[in-house]
């Protein structure tokens, strides 16, 4: 991928995550982290409403099917590893209920939110 294309993809991802964050705020969630990065992985968005914590992967694609297949098992493991690190930093860790969700950003559509996109395998 050329530098120009990489930059374009990066900014497209930023815009998509902003749309997804807006969508979650409309549903009553508070965004507590964006692009949480660790050595083992990255989480696009972390949202919270009460004791429910959403670990959200965001993908912008032409179709929902394309967006869903863009997340493979290896991506899930990296997201889980990053989630473990973030959760360990929380004081109320034992009281939190964690859910792994997915938001697809599709052209000319509202964000498509899939709850429980995958389950933790640990």
Curated annotation (Swiss-Prot):
Domain of life assignment = Bacteria
Pfam families given for it?
UPF0102 (PF02021)
Give the molecular function GO annotations. nucleic acid binding
Entry-linked InterPro entries: Restrct_endonuc-II-like (IPR011335), tRNA_endonuc-like_dom_sf (IPR011856), UPF0102_YraN-like (IPR003509)
By sequence similarity, the record places it as follows:
Belongs to the UPF0102 family.
Tell me the NCBIfam families matching this sequence: PRK12497.1-5
Q: Can you name this protein?
A: UPF0102 protein BARBAKC583_1042
Q: What's the source species for this entry?
A: Bartonella bacilliformis (strain ATCC 35685 / KC583 / Herrer 020/F12,63)
The uppermost taxa in this organism's lineage are:
Bacteria, Pseudomonadati, Pseudomonadota, Alphaproteobacteria, Hyphomicrobiales
């Amino acid at each position: 991928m050329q530098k120009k294309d990489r930059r374009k993809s990066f900014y497209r991802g930023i815009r998509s995550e902003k749309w997804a964050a807006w969508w979650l705020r409309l549903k009553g969630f508070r965004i507590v982290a964006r692009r949480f990065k660790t050595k083992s992985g990255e989480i696009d968005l972390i949202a919270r409403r009460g004791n429910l914590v959403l670990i959200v992967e965001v993908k912008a694609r032409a179709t929902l099917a394309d967006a869903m297949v863009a997340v493979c098992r290896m991506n899930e493991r990296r997201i889980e590893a990053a989630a473990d690190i973030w959760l360990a930093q929380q004081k109320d860790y034992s009281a939190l209920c964690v859910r792994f969700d997915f938001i697809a950003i599709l052209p000319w559509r509202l964000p498509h939110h899939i709850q429980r996109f995958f389950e933790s395998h640990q």
